[in-house]
Amino acid sequence: MSTKDFNLDLVSVSKKDSGASPRITSISLCTPGCKTGALMGCNMKTATCHCSIHVSK
């Protein structure tokens, strides 16, 4: 198994950097009546299909 088998979107930071930068990526596949909606904590009345939030700096 090589390290290229999985893309975990990891960021390496050296000691010279002044701090870490936020890189948050999340994809929500919540739909009303969706079996995974409850597992993801979605409100079934307000859940929408293929919502996504991407925050990167």
UniProtKB/Swiss-Prot annotation:
**Which GO BP terms sit in this record?**
defense response to bacterium; killing of cells of another organism
Family per record: Belongs to the type A lantibiotic family.
Practical applications? Used as a food preservative.
Q: Source species, please?
A: Lactococcus lactis subsp. lactis
Extract the GO molecular function terms from the UniProt entry.
signaling receptor binding
Instruction: Give residue numbers for the modification ((Z)-2,3-didehydrobutyrine).
Output: T25
| Taxonomy, superkingdom | Bacteria
- Cross-link Lanthionine (Ser-Cys): give the residues: S26-C30
Q: Describe the PTM.
A: Maturation of lantibiotics involves the enzymatic conversion of Thr, and Ser into dehydrated AA and the formation of thioether bonds with cysteine. This is followed by membrane translocation and cleavage of the modified precursor. The structure of the 2,3-didehydrobutyrine is not discussed in PubMed:8454055. However, in Fig. 1 the residue is diagrammed as the Z-isomer.
Q: What is the lineage of its organism?
A: Bacteria, Bacillati, Bacillota, Bacilli, Lactobacillales
UniProt key word Membrane: no
Protein name, please? Lantibiotic nisin-A
**Where are the 2,3-didehydroalanine (Ser) modifications?**
S28, S56
The entry's function note states: Lanthionine-containing peptide antibiotic (lantibiotic) active on Gram-positive bacteria. The bactericidal activity of lantibiotics is based on depolarization of energized bacterial cytoplasmic membranes, initiated by the formation of aqueous transmembrane pores.
**Sequence position, cross-link Beta-methyllanthionine (Thr-Cys):** T31-C34, T36-C42, T46-C49, T48-C51
